């Protein structure tokens, strides 16, 4: 790869830039791959409600850990009585039942139970009280609880994903930064602009989001409060400003800037706005991401001749190369436990794939069957990865379980969707 190609790569990836077209329409969930064998779980329609059970069923299916049973179910299940023998005969080990009841102040009580057929006991027996406007959110919370009860791992169905859209149908081909549920439902627009919006990055409390905007005709990093809509400029230095990433305590931000001529990584103290230059060489250093413990960060650099992932330690200011397999490794992001890196990987002679590298062993496993993949982002529990890809000429988001058992697509009917970022919990 020539220096010209590497610089082009840095300008695109340090800012997360992808020139594509997208629509404002809601994303539509499409199952691309389902697990061949997974424990069955029956989600019985809830009493007085027909909206909750399909959401829970869909959530658990797309985890890759379970397969919902929806046909020829025993009719004896209710919130008060479950006949274990009927479910044993049907070969279904887990059953979810529930009901919805009106409560005061335009709210609802959602009572749900998770039943272990073999043990003949309830694993969950809970009541949620939610406003009428949050019944869908309650369904995702039920999915989270069921997933944790059966796997011991916190569920991420009630989370959110940020992404960037561009609508080619409008005269100015407008960009929007949107946030939606992890199944693509309930999209909300954070910002709309005729100029590119790139590299969304959540603050650790998920109350604010940073992004790169070209509204002044040059890249600048903004921080926007999601509740109030208020925003402020964090970085608008001469040249490149991109790839923001927040420290686990939310007090600092790493970003790429070329104010001194070469793309380097800087750290900003968000209370004082003081800068510290973290890299200083002739290479292109970009895409910094803090480790979960805040003691180091990973980044992409071409200092070895091709884009690879490196780690910088705050303790001794040392830098260590992490990736050695493949001609290209970039856009690294760490799992919440700090053990794995999801990255864009290109084996020699192949297309760009999302892969997961175990940091302790250095083993890189290609995760995705698609090509031209970019922008991987782990779910908070580390069990799923969302990324942008193409299927034919269609640009879309895809979510895949890290064991490769399940994949779903989130396309827009009228355009393309890019730059996903999974919100922290």
From Swiss-Prot:
InterPro entries: 6-blade_b-propeller_TolB-like, PD40, Tol-Pal_TolB, TolB_N
Subunit structure: The Tol-Pal system is composed of five core proteins: the inner membrane proteins TolA, TolQ and TolR, the periplasmic protein TolB and the outer membrane protein Pal. They form a network linking the inner and outer membranes and the peptidoglycan layer.
GO cellular component: periplasmic space
Matches recorded under HAMAP family: TolB (MF_00671)
Main location: periplasm
Signal peptide extent: 1-25
Compartments where located: Periplasm
UniProt function note: Part of the Tol-Pal system, which plays a role in outer membrane invagination during cell division and is important for maintaining outer membrane integrity.
Name of the protein in question: Tol-Pal system protein TolB
Highest taxon, organism lineage: Bacteria
UniProt keyword terms in alphabetical order: Cell cycle, Cell division, Periplasm, Signal
Family of this protein: Belongs to the TolB family.
GO biological process: cell division; protein import
Cysteines joined through disulfide linkages: none
Name of the gene encoding the protein in the UniProt record: tolB
